[in-house]
Amino acid sequence: MPNDHFSNGKKIAFTVVMFLYINLALTIFWILKPLKKSLFIGLYNGDQTFKLGSMEMLGSSAELLAKGMNLFIAFMLVVFLTLVSRLAKRQRLTYCCMGLIIAMTFCFSLQINDPSESTVWPFYWFGDLSISLMLAAFFSFLHDTVDLRNAKRLYGFIVLGAVSGGAVGSTYFRGWIEEMNNQQWLHTIIGIGVVICLLAFAAGWMAKSIPHHESKSGPNDVPKKKFNAAIEGASLVFKSRYLIAIAGIVGFYEITSEVLDYQFTAMIERFVPKKDIGSHFGTVYAIGNIAALVVQLCFSIFAAGFPKYRIHWILLALPLAVALSSLFFIIAPILFAASLLKISDSTFAYSVNQTGRETLYNPLSRQEKYVARAFVEVFIQRTGKVAALLIAFLVPMFLNTRNEAGQLETSLLGLQLLGGFTCIIVALWFYCVKIVGQKFESLECEQQQATTIALAQAQEQPSAGTT
């Protein structure tokens, strides 16, 4: 967002529009998340189990299989985003992604009030697909219009929109879960999607005077004609230690997040009555998102006043919170501790960690921002999920038992063992944060020097013309 093209008034207007854009995108996600999860877990409640050959599974274990399918979905999504981003930039990418989401939402709304097993599974996958599409379109637009000089100052406020959207969506769902049926929730999502397209149009109109923000091409950039979409992104990532470390942060977060989510879901499945499952999900999600809103608001104020903060400090907040809550759950495997696992994840993952992670892409070349980011944030993210699911799947397979009524029951010991595994992953996560922190500061210094030289040359040219 160079000052030559944007007045202060336009900067404020653009920031407000992008704030509302990400706010509504996350509102959609936090309506879909408890809705899809409660439908899925409620489908296999002990009386009815999911059968895979001779194996019987509860909803929490069947959910692991549903998430495992995300790897294939991720591959197709990387290809789709890479190909579409070559033809559509900024607001046009939003139109493509949001149009697909609206069409799919309408199709599900025709069956969602009385869903069969064949509807619940695709709807569960749709929940993950929709947020990946919305975030990819949003952050690609944002990175293409904001330069590094403004990124650390503005990203905090814009990501505050994401956090507030989470608080609005989860709180609204919790408050109206008894009043609205499933179809009405999906009709609400369609309406929000149309508004997002209008906001993208407004942001695109304001940003049309800004040339596509492009950092100097790096030596690792890959000619587009040489590779297909997925391989192109992988080639960029694995030739850069910086991008590998970013991929590590994303992958290790997804592993820990999925393990925490399984522990949380299994505890709810074991201790919460079926009729209260949706309400409990909504309550925990609302608490986590409201806490994230408070954290992000405080951070945004701090970042605006002190834009030269060190990036690695905010990237350490989430893994530290995950480690502490996991240790507490190992000591006391109760419903409160399991809920705290999810709250600690939501509080920092959707606030300062998201801000820091997105800022890491800003000093990269355009090809890395679009193609490498799509590979990391979609494919690596889903790969991390699948790795966690395979590990978590072993717990019910070997340790689950049956209660006195003959129903399957999740093993508390197995859930505690997963807590120990999480602590090991967090240690690797810390190492990746150290690498990106050092490299980001180096890239930041290089861009500041380049900006200083460019300004000096611009001042010398008028002087030379007058002599």
Question: Could you tell me what each predicted segment is?
Answer:
Residues W313-V352:
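C-terminal transmembrane helical hairpin of 12-TM major facilitator-type secondary transporters
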Residues M1-Y21, G46, E63-L64, F80-L81, ...:
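Intracellular loop-helix junctions on the cytosolic face of multi-pass helical membrane proteins
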Residues V120, R153-S209, S279, T283-V294, ...:
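Hydrophobic alpha-helical transmembrane segments
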Residues F14-G46, F50-V78, T119-E178, K225-L236, ...:
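Substrate-agnostic recognition of the 12-TM MFS/MFS-like secondary transporter fold
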Residues L297-I314, I330, L394-R402:
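Flexible, glycine/threonine-enriched loop-and-boundary segments that flank and lead into catalytic domains
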Residues L243-Y253, I311-L318:
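Alpha-helical transmembrane segments of multi-pass integral membrane proteins
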Residues G99-S116, L320-I334:
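C-terminal ends and interior cores of transmembrane alpha-helices
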Residues S60, R90-Q91, L148, N182-L186, ...:
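Membrane-helix interface/capping residues of multi-pass secondary transporters
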